[in-house]
Amino acid sequence: MYTTNNRRYIGIAGTIAAGKSTLAKQLSDYWHVPLIKEPISPYLADFYADNKEYAFRMQVYMMASRVKGSLILSRFGGIQDRTIYEDRIFQKVLCDRGDMEQRDYETCSLLYKSLSKPSPDVVIYLKVKPETSIQRQKDRARVKEIGIDEGYMEHLVMAYNTWASQFTGNLITLHWDNPLSVEEVAEQIESFYDN
């Protein structure tokens, strides 16, 4: 069973609207441990309105915010909604699509390599089909997400799957088109720690 004495640092990964925030909150409540929510960037609405103009600023802000969260959780344990690894996925997709200049991508790469970024003990990857992610994003209808291109969402899902297949850390992949209960997820995480 998870206890605060264990100081476990668990990251929840997945594309936009995969269900990360919901699961992160459920696990935090289930185990009564700290939760670092995904930061809401002051650039978010601007970014979705004009990817090219705001991509670099958005990505630098998100990396800095996530590192701050990882430093806290590496010391005290808890759950992190989206990990810094995922910032690299977003940056590559933006560069591949021409929404981030190569020099900005290289600057993000340099910054990423330079940051002190404690790693989660385990990352839970919520794998969804592109159509699931797109539908969930539409269903939640967040004002700041208006303007997300479906092609961008599809590209992100493919990039996440590639990342997961190459990830060298501890990864538990959950097929999240049909979410499990928090108890079922907690059982899988506890089983990971017991082995």
Give each language-model segment a name.
Residues 134-195:
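NTP-dependent small-molecule kinase module
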Residues 23, 27:
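Hydrophobic positions on the alpha1 helix immediately C-terminal to the Walker A/P-loop
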Residues 15:
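P-loop (Walker A) phosphate-binding loop of NTP-binding proteins
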Residues 12:
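Hydrophobic anchor at the beta1->P-loop junction of P-loop NTPases
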Residues 90-159:
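A glycine- and Lys/Arg-enriched "phosphate-lid" helix/loop adjacent to the NTP-binding pocket
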Residues 54-118:
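Glycine-rich phosphate-binding loop used to anchor ATP phosphates in small-molecule kinases
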Residues 20:
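Conserved lysine of the Walker
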Residues 29-68:
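Conserved substrate/cofactor phosphate-moiety recognition/catalytic segment
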